[in-house]
Amino acid sequence: MNTMLFSPYTIRGLTLKNRIVMSPMCMYSCDTKDGAVRTWHKIHYPARAVGQVGLIIVEATGVTPQGRISERDLGIWSDDHIAGLRELVGLVKEHGAAIGIQLAHAGRKSQVPGEIIAPSAVPFDDSSPTPKEMTKADIEETVQAFQNGARRAKEAGFDVIEIHAAHGYLINEFLSPLSNRRQDEYGGSPENRYRFLGEVIDAVREVWDGPLFVRISASDYHPDGLTAKDYVPYAKRMKEQGVDLVDVSSGAIVPARMNVYPGYQVPFAELIRREADIPTGAVGLITSGWQAEEILQNGRADLVFLGRELLRNPYWPYAAARELGAKISAPVQYERGWRF
């Protein structure tokens, strides 16, 4: 069977062998707490490349030490990180996958000891510390940190950069009126709340000419928060700035009850793809080959991002191929076991 899931996809000169993407998922495995790649990362990510995932995106990687979600996160704030990341890139590419990295700053959701920063001095919840409101100098330094991270990612050999603007972390905190109470040019109107992300995109694009993704939370799940419709003009602006794909997730800007079910976020990706005319990635409880194929065949998204399913089964592409009646190449070492 000819499938879309196992057809190549080209984006800004990079051709992926299929439409399956491993979502960035924090592993919290830097036991040295210095942001360096560890043995776990060198096993975990290449295993999914062996499993025939087309694109693997490395977890949220801190552009500053304080920008990490936890002390056990990967980092890209120092040139000392480049060698380990370069080794990881080589291991993944050796097994036929493309590799990206998600550049991130946790903002008020950072659990690293010390001062935390955010657009406004508004805590995430009643049990969270109150962050320091960022000054203009803080904003400039953080934009520069994203650019420096992009430069290091390029030196390490990554194929794709994704900017993390979702899940209640720093960039998302600027975008949402629930967390951004500023009265200057970085707060208030939708245009002002987008300004920080816009500056990050421009700064990254100055040093990075490869495929650029942005992950968003397309719904705040709050009556006073943002909806997928609100993200359409943002996505149009991203496209104008040279973003190639919007990775569409949702939630986590404030504590909220979410109705979670298979494919629950796919309509957000579909709406943004249709109304902003930009490629999108769909993510969220996509578990079967037929489900992934339906999303692609019906033009609801361009790529399918898998998270927990690839934690359960590093060889999910093989299972999906069998389900769809498609034939894919097996690693030579596994040919005796991969039967179609």
Curated annotation (Swiss-Prot):
Pfam families: Oxidored_FMN
Keyword Nucleotide-binding: no
Keyword Magnesium appears in the UniProt entry: no
Keywords, alphabetical: Detoxification, Flavoprotein, FMN, NADP, Oxidoreductase
Cofactors that this protein relies on: FMN
GO molecular function: FMN binding; NADP binding; NADPH dehydrogenase activity
Subunit structure of this chain's protein: Homotetramer.
Protein name: NADPH dehydrogenase
Organism per entry: Geobacillus kaustophilus (strain HTA426)
Lineage: Bacteria, Bacillati, Bacillota, Bacilli, Bacillales
Gene behind this protein: namA
